Amino acid sequence: MSDEEHHFESKADAGASKTYPQQAGTIRKSGYIVIKGRPCKVVEVSTSKTGKHGHAKCHFVAIDIFNGKKLEDIVPSSHNCDVPHVNRTDYQLIDISEDGFVSLLTENGNTKDDLRLPTDDALLNQVKGGFEEGKDLVLSVMSAMGEEQICAVKDIGTKS
C-alpha cells in the first residue's frame, strides 16, 4: 500500500452515460429519443396492435434536435429505447469573435469560448444584431450526447 494521495480532475460529465433506457411504449410526443445515434424530439407516436407473431410496435417520428432532420423508427413497445439526457443552460453573451465563435459567461464567472454562432439565420441575425446594438443578451444552449448548440436568445436590457 502506498501513502500517495490521488488527485482527480473533475470532468463535466464525470463518466455519466449520455443516454438512459426507457421502454418504447412509455415514450410520448414531445419526449426525447435516440434514433440512428442522434438525439431527437418526438413529434408523432403511433402504436400498432399485437400481431399474430409478436409484440405491439411503436412507430416514432422525430426531429433531430441539432440539425432539424426528420427521422423515423419502429420498435416493439416492450423493448427499451435510448433516451438522451438533454440539458438547457443559459449563458450571458460577452463577445463574438471574428471567426464565428461566441464568448459566454457561466454561472460561476468563467468564460465558455467553444461554441459557434447558430446556423439558423433568424437566430444568427438576432444574436449579431442585438450584440451590435449593445444589448445584454442571454443565450440558451442545448446540450445532449456530447453536442452543444445555441437554441434561443433573450434580451435582458441594454448595457449600462
Swiss-Prot record:
Residues 1-21 are annotated as: Disordered. Lys-52 undergoes hypusination, a unique post-translational modification that consists in the addition of a butylamino group from spermidine to lysine side chain, leading to the formation of the unusual amino acid hypusine. eIF-5As are the only known proteins to undergo this modification, which is essential for their function. Keywords: Hypusine, Initiation factor, Protein biosynthesis. PROSITE patterns: IF5A_HYPUSINE. It holds the Pfam family eIF-5a. Residues 1-12 have a biased composition (Basic and acidic residues). GO terms for molecular function: ribosome binding; RNA binding; translation elongation factor activity; translation initiation factor activity. Gene3D superfamilies: 2.30.30.30, Nucleic acid-binding proteins. One of its GO terms (biological process) is positive regulation of translational termination. The modification Hypusine is found at K52. Belongs to the eIF-5A family. Translation factor that promotes translation elongation and termination, particularly upon ribosome stalling at specific amino acid sequence contexts. Binds between the exit (E) and peptidyl (P) site of the ribosome and promotes rescue of stalled ribosome: specifically required for efficient translation of polyproline-containing peptides as well as other motifs that stall the ribosome. Acts as a ribosome quality control (RQC) cofactor by joining the RQC complex to facilitate peptidyl transfer during CAT tailing step. This is Eukaryotic translation initiation factor 5A-1/2.
